[in-house]
């Protein structure tokens, strides 16, 4: 249970996404409020990461989720980048009139997917984080429905991402066939020992 403290940033962002959706449903004209709450949520998640300094490398969920110095640094960089995007895009979304409750929520979902990818130590967890990030970015790429270029970008991104996801899954299946595992550490050990799962 103590180790679960290390994933409080991810848990908090997940709860923030659900809370912001509820606020958007029950409170009309709440786009600006949700936008500001999103920035506050990212700041709180950043504070949670700093509140739990990493002394050693830790693994969670049967070694499928890893917390270390590198993953912590990359999460901090991701959250800071998310805050920067929110601050710099505030005027743009108002000028183009695309400031809706979905915009900050999708951005939070994408950031959550990135954080899952960063700490993933398993092919399945990595793929889940990748899809969570990608699905949000599909919509964000085509968010300005009145702009044909935005719609075109969203469609192209979706098609290319669907193709790349299929190739990734195929590659993951080959790796699993060679190593008999989806865990990164076990995959490396099996490959280093020249044990490719061949009979």
Where are these regions (language model features)?
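Alpha-helical transmembrane segments of multi-pass membrane proteins predominantly involved
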Residues: 1-199
């Amino acid at each position: 249970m103590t180790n679960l403290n290390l994933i409080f940033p991810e848990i908090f962002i997940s709860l923030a996404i659900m809370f912001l959706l509820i606020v958007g449903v029950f409170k009309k004209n709440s786009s600006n409020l949700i936008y500001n709450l999103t920035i506050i949520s990212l700041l709180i998640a950043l504070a949670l990461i700093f509140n739990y300094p990493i002394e050693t490398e830790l693994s969670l969920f049967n070694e499928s989720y890893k917390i270390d110095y590198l993953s912590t640094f990359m999460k901090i960089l991701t959250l800071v980048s998310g805050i920067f995007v929110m601050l710099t895009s505030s005027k743009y979304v108002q000028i183009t009139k695309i400031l809706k409750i979905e915009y900050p929520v999708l951005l939070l979902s994408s950031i959550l997917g990135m954080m899952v990818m960063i700490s993933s130590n398993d092919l399945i967890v990595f793929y889940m984080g990748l899809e969570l990030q990608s699905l949000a970015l599909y919509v964000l790429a085509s968010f300005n429905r009145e702009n044909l270029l935005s719609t075109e970008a969203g469609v192209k991104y979706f098609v290319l991402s669907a193709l790349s996801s299929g190739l990734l899954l195929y590659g993951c299946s080959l790796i699993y066939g060679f190593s008999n595992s989806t865990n990164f550490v076990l995959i490396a050990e099996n490959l280093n020992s020249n044990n490719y799962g061949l009979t």
